[in-house]
Amino acid sequence: MDQSNRYADLSLKEEDLIAGQNHILVAYTMEPAAGYGYLEVAAHIAAESSTGTNVEVCTTDDFTKGVDAIVYDIDEANGIMKVAYPFDLFDRNGLDGKTMIVSFLTLAIGNNQGMGDVKNLQMFDFWVPETKLHLFDGPAVDITNMWKMLGRDKDNGGYIAGTIIKPKLGLRPEPFADAAYQFWLGGDFIKNDEPQGNQTFCPMKKVIPLVADAMKRAQDETGETKLFSANITADDHHEMCYRADYILETFGADAPQVAFLVDGYVGGPGMITTARRNYPSQYLHYHRAGHGAITSPSAKRGYTAFVLAKISRLQGASGIHVGTMGYGKMEGDASDKNIAYMIERDECQGPAFYQKWNGMKPTTPIISGGMNALRLPGFFENLGHGNVINTSGGGSYGHIDSPAAGATSLRQSYECWKSGADPIEFAKDHKEFARAFESFPADADKIYPGWREKLGVHK
């Protein structure tokens, strides 16, 4: 059934929809299945994503039609369509009237993913009216809170050198805590790897007290504040809160230095919201494990990594992993820096829409996946700043001297870039950074050809 007469209006102007502040606008790449027209399928998507179905129903009235999602723009040559969703379509909390992210996802990227007349459909951007942003939680704390604890400048506190405890699984409590202590002697921030929690060989109630003690000892030895991101991911919110409460109680006076890591993609929006609303004083660390199933550049359905990051800011994530922008081991390229810009700035141009955040706190880009001291200068140069959290597991524990030396090499890498120094010349006066060349020779050969001769290192 062709529903374009009701669910499409190509005379609508985007600037008018934006000025009206009454719609969420969504941009998709779309390819119809063979034998179907582009506008026909686009209208069917809008219908299925709002008030329609595959037949006319007798219960539809004029009010219902007033909240139809409408296709307002198509670019068939480039396979792009845009839909305006009336804001009133989205479910609201009974408790506080906030708009539910799950409702947005259910409509904008729900049943339309399985329609028979659609070959491919992927959301690549969306726009939220500035006047409606207060209906989303947004972050409660951000990187400025961490900078304050670290004694940094409150507006431009710079790079936070972090790691992931490696190996990701298999360490018992004592070796785990020792690995944390060794890194903290040179670095700032440690996160649980996303599967770490309460395994039988490393029970939470044994390892967390040891990690809290390791933090205290490292702080005493270095005179620096240390940060820990503890995984509270679980199948239900009672278990999440049980873990969170135990962790905060165990860290005691150092509890403000604890972030909560949540596997937000596999766990879903409700898990992020549980952490955000129950623990607004803690840094909310959104890990996106599993997202590549739909956000991979090879995927043609679902939504992009850009969309996931933008959603995370609305949900209230203090920070989210954004890949490595082509400088690490994860999928992505240099243009992914726009993901970071969208979540850290108060306004930014996305692939389709210019989003103003109206003062909503920023979400910090968290960089991880194959990064080390040699790869970071190029990364910083591409991004244009170093106000990120970087968690380098192999880049720390793979350093030829020690995890502390690996952590120090990360810090030195940032200082090298910030000062505008040539990395090889900088290495001559910075031992830990220099030893990173020997620690990661394959990277050194690729990024800094001739480094052996220049640094006097021989095979």
UniProtKB/Swiss-Prot annotation:
A Gene Ontology biological process term: reductive pentose-phosphate cycle
Coiled coil spans: none
Binding of substrate, residues: 111, 168, 288, 321, 368
Gene3D superfamilies: Ribulose bisphosphate carboxylase, large subunit, C-terminal domain (3.20.20.110), RuBisCO large subunit, N-terminal domain (3.30.70.150)
Pfam families: RuBisCO_large, RuBisCO_large_N
Cofactor comment text: Binds 1 Mg(2+) ion per subunit.
Annotated residues for binding of Mg(2+): 191, 193-194
Factors inducing expression: Induced by growth in high levels of dissolved inorganic carbon and low NH(3) levels (at protein level).
Active site: 166 (proton acceptor), 287 (proton acceptor)
EC annotation from Swiss-Prot or TrEMBL: 4.1.1.39
Modified residues (N6-carboxylysine): 191
Top-rank taxon: Bacteria
MF annotations from Gene Ontology: magnesium ion binding; monooxygenase activity; ribulose-bisphosphate carboxylase activity
Catalytic activity: 2 (2R)-3-phosphoglycerate + 2 H(+) = D-ribulose 1,5-bisphosphate + CO2 + H2O; D-ribulose 1,5-bisphosphate + O2 = 2-phosphoglycolate + (2R)-3-phosphoglycerate + 2 H(+)
Chain's role: RuBisCO catalyzes two reactions: the carboxylation of D-ribulose 1,5-bisphosphate, the primary event in carbon dioxide fixation, as well as the oxidative fragmentation of the pentose substrate. Both reactions occur simultaneously and in competition at the same active site.
Family: Belongs to the RuBisCO large chain family. Type II subfamily.
Assembly behavior: Homodimer.
Extra remark beyond the main annotation: The basic functional RuBisCO is composed of a large chain homodimer in a 'head-to-tail' conformation. In contrast to form I RuBisCO, the form II RuBisCO are composed solely of large subunits.
Protein name stated in the entry: Ribulose bisphosphate carboxylase
Gene: cbbM
